[in-house]
Amino acid sequence: MSDAAESSESSDWVTRHAVRAACRSRLVGLLVVVALLAGARHAAAQQPGPVPVDSISPDKAEFLPRSRFQLAANSLSGGDPRFTWDARFGGSADVLDYHFGRLGIVGDYEAVVGSERRNFDVEQGLYILEASTSGRIGANEVAMVFHHVSRHLSDRLKPKATAWNVFEGRYLRNLDFSGTQVAVVAGVGNVVTHVDVDYTWNLNIDINVRHQISPRVGLYARGLAEAFGVDPVIRGRTDPQHSGRFEGGVRLHGRGGILELFAGVEHRLDADLHDYIPVTWGIMGFRLVNK
């Protein structure tokens, strides 16, 4: 065999080895993030927001008619050592359905994982807590919501807390277009208290589109957008600040839950608690949801 052929084979072997090593590294990273979330589940009531519902309780009130829980993790592109993975564990529950509306609670824990000090370094922890009451008008639902967000640094000095509370009006609706399900959640609120942020008001919308291909497989696309008004006295910013996320993928149905595999893009305002600058990432990950 010629030296050129041997060199070519050696180069191919190195390339294949590097690709396999990179894949193993990403897989190990995803498993570590899941483990971090599983261990963190006792630290707080970690739950995502409420979703529109089609089935309502009978004329009499019903206690705990429904609940929803999720575990999710996704990679963050860009190579910034502060932002490598993003992961969530949480759920929501309707404590009481009184037929013409419901009382609900929500809690969510998010871990932002970087690689500054070690391969998997939890840099930020974010808690969301909500309480809401709603009323139904036909197929529409309107809710009053108290929404709390608290952001923390992990293993890092931060003398001042970062938190805000929003009193919000929210609209929820399910739509059906020839078998394609569309869930719409939109809200507008006033930031009633805040610490170390300049937010004054909030607008948000969440649109989730799903289409079932077979009993076991479906497709989905989801878009979320959020805007905050700001107080120029605090940080000198005058224009509203924006966040957004779009993801799409497949939904694999099992007897006890649903696995979503997705890819997309996210633009997050004030991603770093020191710099308060927006960051845009490509994302790829999974989500487990109970039925």
Say what each PLM segment does.
Residues 46-291:
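Transmembrane beta-barrel domains of bacterial outer-membrane proteins
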Residues 1-50, 291:
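Cleavable N-terminal export/targeting peptides
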